[in-house]
Each structure stands twice: as C-alpha cells, then as structure tokens.
From Swiss-Prot:
Active-site residues, as the UniProt record annotates them: 90, 93, 116
Identification of the protein by name: Cyanate hydratase
EC number, as in UniProt: 4.2.1.104
Species of the source: Aquifex aeolicus (strain VF5)
Gene symbol of the encoding locus: cynS
Matching Pfam families: Cyanate_lyase, HTH_3
Length: 149
C-alpha cells in the first residue's frame, strides 16, 4: 500500500485487502467500474449517500466513519513528477511519447479542442493475444472544442 495517501484512503484499502476483496468485488457492490471504485477509495471521487452505504456494507463499517467520502475531493497528484512508481511512470511515458501524435490525429478528427477528464470514463481490461496477457486501457471522454470569443 502507498504511504502518500490520506488516512481514510489507507484505512479503506487496508480493509479491502484484509477482507480479501478485489476491485471487481467493490465494483459489483457499488454498481460502478473498478477504476471508479479505486478512485473513490484513493480519494479522487466524491461519493453520494448510496455509495457510502454500499461501501459501509461491503467493508462492515458504520456510514458515519465514511462521511468524508461525501466531501468534494482535493485532486492533488499523489505521485512526484515524473512519477517514481514503474506502472505510473510507464503511463506518463506513454503520454509524453505519444501525446503530440495523438493530439495531431485528434485535431484532424474533431477540430481544435481537448478531451474532457471530467466527463470521461476509464476502462481497463485484460485480453489474451498470441499467448500473452495484454492490458487494454480505454479513455472515453467528451470532446470539448475551444470556444472563440
């Protein structure tokens, strides 16, 4: 478990681990994607009453212990820049390496704008290809055109 996350996040992640739960288990209980559930536990998403109730039931906790989950999160990066964790660094490297080409192709397809990171979903799947496990990471974000004024 990471040492640079908040008190509640540490508690929730440790509790999940001690109960032998996976992110898929949490996902089924909350009715949200595994990535969203991990974001919630890590303090990057804001829970509604229904989600707090589901987390409390899943982790055998009192809802009042989870009241902080209903607060708007302070979405400060929890990794140094550049990241030092190998997995997170590789994602950073992908953006640095492919970013300019992706931007150019996206602008040809959609026009001048950006992909929303707010109106966006992230999906992660495991596939088998040529006898090897592969990871498919999908960002599905609304295209926001720059406005002229």
């Amino acid at each position: 478990m990471r040492s640079d996350i908040g008190r509640l996040s540490k508690y929730l992640i440790e509790r999940k681990k001690n109960l032998g739960l996976t992110w898929e288990d949490v996902s089924r209980k909350l009715g949200k994607s595994p990535v969203y559930c991990a974001m919630l536990f890590y303090g990057y998403a804001q829970a509604d009453d229904e989600e707090v109730k589901a987390v409390a039931e899943l982790l055998n906790l009192e809802e009042k212990e989870l009241a902080e989950l209903k607060d708007a999160p302070y979405r400060e990066p929890q990794q140094p820049v550049p990241p030092t964790d190998p997995f997170v660094y590789r994602l950073y490297e992908v953006v640095i390496l492919y970013g300019p080409a992706l931007k150019d192709v996206a602008h040809e397809m959609f026009g001048d704008g950006i992909m929303s990171a707010i109106d966006m979903s992230v999906e992660l799947e495991k596939v088998e290809q040529e006898g090897a496990e592969r990871m498919v990471l999908t960002f599905n974000g609304k295209w926001l055109k720059y406005r002229k004024f």
